[in-house]
Design a protein with these regions (language model features):
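Hydrophobic residues within membrane-embedded alpha helices
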Residues: 12-13, 132
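Alpha-helical cap/lid subdomain in secreted, periplasmic
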Residues: 81-283
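Bacterial N-terminal signal peptides
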Residues: 2-12
């Protein structure tokens, strides 16, 4: 009996201790910051879909796109200061800043329009310089095309602004995602009818008829309507106002399908022009 007990103790002593936990390898996270207008912001642009579906869990993605903003007004209102603070947040190995403007820098937008030859490129250069000074990697994007058609051909009304972005990217050696060229080629191949399926809201019958004839971008004039009785004033609400989503149909902004489409385009282009980003992208 004593011999069996001694054998048991000897066997127990010879059992190897459990293996130690492997050393913890700390992650090396990156951050992607989106800076731009409504064609990039959530619910009307591609940015929300990009952050939600095209970035891995090893990168934070912050969409700071703001509807109606230009290179001038985005800075003037303080949105760029918010972006700079995001760039300076510690803990990230790489911080990438995607900058896309052009739509609201065009003429006819008081407080937002910029001079194409001087002010617009100067504003872009300043964004690039300050992003680099904050330790971030700026990436310029040409503006998403509008889906205007005339006689079956897409109207390239943003080409001069896209050219200016390309010139600044070349001059300052900034990675460039030529979203304008890529989106214009895609929309041209679709044609006005199919391209309309990527818009917020729904077109009316006149707009559908115009698209079938190869045209889009301007709503045909409606016949004069009989004056309607004034609607009663809505009762005041104690609830705070909520943000506007903007469901009106147009040929600039994107619904969910459109956002998904062009988020994929941006992810693929980023993987090509900046291969170091591939591990954090889902093309």
């Amino acid at each position: 009996m004593i011999g069996l007990f001694a054998a048991f103790l000897l066997q127990a002593a010879s059992v190897a201790p459990p293996p130690a936990d492997p050393p913890v390898v700390r992650i090396k996270p990156s951050k992607i910051i989106l800076v731009g207008d409504s064609t990039m912001q959530v619910n009307s642009g591609w940015g929300g879909s990009f952050c939600a579906t095209r970035v891995t869990s090893f990168a934070a993605c912050v969409d700071l796109g703001r509807g109606g903003r230009s290179t001038k007004s985005y800075r003037a209102e303080g949105s760029w200061d918010i972006a700079l603070n995001e760039m300076k947040t510690p803990g990230y190995v790489h911080v990438y800043v995607l900058i896309q403007f052009g739509h609201n820098d065009q003429p006819g937008k008081p407080g937002r329009s910029t001079d194409l030859a001087t002010e617009f490129p100067a504003n872009l250069r300043r964004y690039v310089t300050e992003a680099r000074a904050a330790g971030a990697i700026p990436i310029l994007l040409t503006p998403l095309t509008r889906r205007y058609f005339k006689d079956g051909q897409i109207t390239r009304d943003l080409d001069p602004w896209a050219d200016a972005v390309r010139a600044v990217a070349k001059e300052m050696k900034v990675p460039l995602v030529d979203l304008n060229a890529r989106s214009a080629a895609i929309i041209q191949a679709m044609g006005p009818v199919l391209a309309g399926h990527y818009s917020l809201g729904l077109p009316d019958a006149a707009m559908v008829g115009s698209a079938l004839a190869g045209n889009s971008g301007e709503k045909p004039p409606a016949p004069p309507a009989a004056p309607a009785a004034p609607a009663p004033a809505p009762a005041a609400s104690a609830l705070p106002k909520v943000g506007m989503r903007g469901d009106g149909f147009d040929y600039t902004h994107l619904n969910r399908d459109g956002a998904d489409l062009f988020a994929g385009v941006v992810a693929n282009e980023l993987a090509l022009v900046l291969p170091e980003m591939r591990p954090i992208l889902i093309p």
